[in-house]
């Protein structure tokens, strides 16, 4: 395909509003353009990459018996009222009315639609299982769209739904999807982890997230590609290396989520769901009597601990939340942080939010900084992290401004429900006892859920079982963020290309090393001088030969400076560059492997044979 015929509007500079490298490079390399806040046009290069990813998905889903279809994006609100999500989904839901004043939404997900279709068509367990999916644009009214395709108001998603007559059958399909997702993301060239996830607004029972890891850009060997003009990193002057390090560090590490994973096992979880190894301890010290002490001007745990000369681990942090309009007291060891997802899940609450200071005063009789679990009103619900029960003679707020109590002992001085509600810390033992927890940032690219009967119960989707009884259909849900795959791939495969000019100056610029399976084209064929007829003829022959061998070829036939062509080639990021230059009359061309920066001159007649050898090596 001729580059002059494509819309590839590359830019000479990075866009000023981009904070993450994937957003900057997608815009600069001419892959996307923003039409409105959080709404993007996918230009030819991006569209080709997305279509290649769709092909990978379709091939893997066919292996597990998943069937593609297409549902409408414009949905009646009545379906969402049936499930209860019309009221609970929140402000992100696009709501609109037609000319008859009927309520509609733009679908962010399609559980209700697929449930209704199957409910109306399937009557017997003999018609199950069903495994359906679609690839479609979704809509979410994000309050603050950001980071390019990672947080948008319109996005492309693959959402699949499976329908079963029992949970055992669901388990089989769930495992099929887990393996299919691993195959898809592996083929896409992603470094990813399957982690324990939160069902969130989907209402799932069990769930697993697939996170593309976005590591810090500190390893020069990984992130920097040297041109053939530079033998090794050691040849680069120290001051230039420092500039390169600064450029790598200048771009924010993307990823909405923090992942906690074990250094020695397969355990991995979203930080919201991560736990650690917990061992109850036996109390050995005698229990002191409660004593009220004045703690003037002490509002925080560290201030109280310093004032009383105790360790923060000997204090109790007391928080008040409102869960579905009911007050709930949450307790933590002083140096721990609350994990509101764990608390919300434990309470099975639809809404959970921190109480205001006015609400805290009404409940405790004191303001923030002096709250505690002792002598609360009878019937008060207290949920404490499991570590709290190991404390002896702890310090807690006295529910009196400017005062705390010492000698607080769980069980004697207050009763609580003990459960894991804390945020894990890096370096703690993995819950399986193997290795310690490390953190990484990640981009969620896929999520699978065991929905169970969440939607079939609320929407009356039943079948007749083996005994002729009406039972709810058991469901699974399986999503992949198709458009954000482009961001994830670029985040992982962006590179800083460094070269040395004939004058001895060092220059560096960002580009992409697209993995072969997702690159919009396989080969970038560049004619240095389009006015040279010999070069033109050789280019045409090579394009035809490569295409005949199954390569997708992008031919740069533009009448541009060679430096501009090479810069655009680095930006676009195709795996192989073939240059027809000054030696065209001799039948000599240059091959450059983008991933390594390695280049070689070959006879044009041996080009395809050489490419087959080189691509096997890389």
From Swiss-Prot:
A GO MF term: transferase activity
Domain of life: Bacteria
Disulfide bonds: none
GO terms for cellular component: cytosol
Entries under InterPro entries matching the protein: aa-tRNA-synt_IIb, aa-tRNA-synth_II, aa-tRNA-synth_II/BPL/LPL, Anticodon-bd, Anticodon-bd_dom_sf, Pro-tRNA-ligase_IIa, Pro-tRNA-synth_IIa_bac-type, Pro-tRNA-Synthase_IIa_type1
Substrates-to-products reaction catalysed: tRNA(Pro) + L-proline + ATP = L-prolyl-tRNA(Pro) + AMP + diphosphate
E.C. numbers: 6.1.1.15
Keyword Phosphoprotein: no
Subcellular location: Cytoplasm
PROSITE patterns tied to this protein: AA_TRNA_LIGASE_II
Single GO biological process annotation from the record: prolyl-tRNA aminoacylation
Keywords for this protein: Aminoacyl-tRNA synthetase, ATP-binding, Cytoplasm, Ligase, Nucleotide-binding, Protein biosynthesis
Quaternary state and interactors: Homodimer.
Record text about domains: Consists of three domains: the N-terminal catalytic domain, the editing domain and the C-terminal anticodon-binding domain.
Function comment: Catalyzes the attachment of proline to tRNA(Pro) in a two-step reaction: proline is first activated by ATP to form Pro-AMP and then transferred to the acceptor end of tRNA(Pro). As ProRS can inadvertently accommodate and process non-cognate amino acids such as alanine and cysteine, to avoid such errors it has two additional distinct editing activities against alanine. One activity is designated as 'pretransfer' editing and involves the tRNA(Pro)-independent hydrolysis of activated Ala-AMP.
HAMAP family: Pro_tRNA_synth_type1 (MF_01569)
Family, similarity comment: Belongs to the class-II aminoacyl-tRNA synthetase family. ProS type 1 subfamily.
Protein name: Proline--tRNA ligase
């Amino acid at each position: 395909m001729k580059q002059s015929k494509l819309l590839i509007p590359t830019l000479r500079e990075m866009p000023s509003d981009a904070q993450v490298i994937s957003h900057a490079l997608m815009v600069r390399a001419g892959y996307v353009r923003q039409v409105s806040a959080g709404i993007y046009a996918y230009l030819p290069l991006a569209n080709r990459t997305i279509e290649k990813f769709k092909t990978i998905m379709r091939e893997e889903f066919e292996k597990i018996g998943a069937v593609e279809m297409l549902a409408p994006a414009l949905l009646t609100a009545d379906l969402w009222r049936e499930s209860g999500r019309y009221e609970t989904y929140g402000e992100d839901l696009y709501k609109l009315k037609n000319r008859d004043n009927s309520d509609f939404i733009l679908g962010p997900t399609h559980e209700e639609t697929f449930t209704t279709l199957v409910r109306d068509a399937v009557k017997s367990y003999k018609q199950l299982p069903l495994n359906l999916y679609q690839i479609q644009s979704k809509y979410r009214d994000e309050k603050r769209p950001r980071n390019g395709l990672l947080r948008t108001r319109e996005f492309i998603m693959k959402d699949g739904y499976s329908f079963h007559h029992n949970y055992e059958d669901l388990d089989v399909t769930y495992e099929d999807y887990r393996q299919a997702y691993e195959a898809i993301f592996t083929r896409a060239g992603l470094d990813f982890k399957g982690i324990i996830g939160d069902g969130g607004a989907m209402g799932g029972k069990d769930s697993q997230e697939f996170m593309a890891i976005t590591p810090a850009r500190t390893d020069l060997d990984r992130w920097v590609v040297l041109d053939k003009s530079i033998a090794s990193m050691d040849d680069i002057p120290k001051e230039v290396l420092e500039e390169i390090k600064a450029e790598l560090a200048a771009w924010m590490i993307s990823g909405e989520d923090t992942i906690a994973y074990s250094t020695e096992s397969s355990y991995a979880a979203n930080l919201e769901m991560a736990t650690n190894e917990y061992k109850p301890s036996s109390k050995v010290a005698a229990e002191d009597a409660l004593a009220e002490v004045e703690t003037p001007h002490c509002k925080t745990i560290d201030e109280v601990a310093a004032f009383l000369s105790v360790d923060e681990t000997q204090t109790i942090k007391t928080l008040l939340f409102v869960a579905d309009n009911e007050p709930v007291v949450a307790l933590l060891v002083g140096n721990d942080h609350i994990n509101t997802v764990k608390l919300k899940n434990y309470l099975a609450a639809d809404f959970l939010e921190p109480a205001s200071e006015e609400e805290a005063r009404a409940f405790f009789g004191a303001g923030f900084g002096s709250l505690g679990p002792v002598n609360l009103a009878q019937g008060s619900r207290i949920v404490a992290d499991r570590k709290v029960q190991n404390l002896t003679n702890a310090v807690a707020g006295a529910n009196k401004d400017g005062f705390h109590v010492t000698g607080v002992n769980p069980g004697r001085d207050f009763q609580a429900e003990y459960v894991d509600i804390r945020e894990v810390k890096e370096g703690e033992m993995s819950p399986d006892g193997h290795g310690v927890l490390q953190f990484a940032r990640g981009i969620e690219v896929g999520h699978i859920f065991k929905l169970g009967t969440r939607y079939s119960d609320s929407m009356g989707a039943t079948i007749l079982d083996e005994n002729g009884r009406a039972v709810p259909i058991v469901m699974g849900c399986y999503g992949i963020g198709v458009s954000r795959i482009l961001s994830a791939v670029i985040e992982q495969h962006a590179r800083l290309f460094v070269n040395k000019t004939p004058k001895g100056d060092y220059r560096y610029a960002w580009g992409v090393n697209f993995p072969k399976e997702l690159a919009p084209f396989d080969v970038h064929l560049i004619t240095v001088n389009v006015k040279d007829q010999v070069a033109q003829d050789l280019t045409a022959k090579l394009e035809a030969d490569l295409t005949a061998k199954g390569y997708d070829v992008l031919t740069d036939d533009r009448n541009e400076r060679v430096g501009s062509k090479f810069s655009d080639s680095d930006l676009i990021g195709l795996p192989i560059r073939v240059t027809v230059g000054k030696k065209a009359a001799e039948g000599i061309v240059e091959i450059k492997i983008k991933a390594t920066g390695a280049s070689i001159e070959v006879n044009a007649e041996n080009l395809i044979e050489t490419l087959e050898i080189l691509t096997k090596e890389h």
